[in-house]
Amino acid sequence: MKPLIRRLSRIADSSSCNRNRSGDIHHPTSTYSSSVFLVKRATVASSVPSGHVPVNVGEDKERFVVSAELLNHPVFVGLLNRSAQEYGYTQKGVLHIPCNVFVFEQVVESLRSGIADDTSELIASLSGEDVSTE
């Protein structure tokens, strides 16, 4: 797990401009806050600020930018374990998390608001799977 987290913390988009799904070119801008639990839905491909990791969530692989500090939280470690089980440790590029986007957003919001105790139960109830860290 440590090599995966180290690798994820080094992932950054090195291009100066990127293409979105329709092929239009967008130049990245830095509009990110310095919040510890920053999660921003990336509507277009953009550069990843230092200390953050790009994450694709769900079957449609919606892109989010997540603070690397969030990766150490036990609930997020459970999501990383689920990702490792489904995709293995050999996946390249952006991390894929097999979780419903709504569930992911609720998990992040509960972590941000400090009510993370019920987060594992929330994930299990909405996704039908257990993401315990044991």
UniProtKB/Swiss-Prot annotation:
A Gene Ontology BP annotation from the UniProt entry: auxin-activated signaling pathway
Keyword Mitochondrion: no
Sorted UniProt keywords: Auxin signaling pathway, Cytoplasm, Developmental protein, Growth regulation
Superkingdom field: Eukaryota
A Pfam family annotated for this UniProt entry: Auxin_inducible
GO CC field: cytoplasm
Localization of this protein: Cytoplasm
Subunit structure: Interacts with and inhibits PP2C-D subfamily of type 2C phosphatases such as PP2C67/PP2C-D1.
The family this protein is said to belong to: Belongs to the ARG7 family.
Protein name per Swiss-Prot or TrEMBL: Auxin-responsive protein SAUR40
